């Protein structure tokens, strides 16, 4: 289980009072400041230890315009790290370890670069999960070795399946297929 703060953004959110989920193991309550006043559009989400892994749905409502449509999100068991837009170049990548989930958003007109180490014979699956969470990002990915040689790519799917042929550092390049980006490209 875990707890985290969720900030809801968008239009027509005046008077937002609740956040509900597709499973009872997920609960949220409005965040309050030190004076006990509700912080607008911010909720404290509690995920129970027995919450099922996978895709869940969230709704918000209680304001002037009733309930929202649902938005999907993932409950996972891998450590999560904030990657922002990834590294700006292969020379300055965002470094991560195999077995981590990177969270971030794609910048418009740019690549995000990620670096990881792998051992010879180690199979690596790098998946960019966007369709299941209603992201506008259409992932285009490519995998490179330390010399800059492209080893694999998936121009419109977001899945790289790779077995390292030698110990070393490897790089994933990510961008939107149409080079779009911003807050909705997560």
What residue ranges belong to the model's regions?
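Acidic, Ser/Thr/Pro-rich low-complexity intrinsically disordered segments
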Residues: 2-31, 36-40, 49, 63, ...
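A short beta-strand micro-motif common to beta-rich folds, especially ectodomain repeats
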Residues: 51-62
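Short intrinsically disordered coil segments
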Residues: 60-61, 86-91, 155-158
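Predominantly extracellular/luminal regions of secreted and cell-surface proteins
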Residues: 70-98
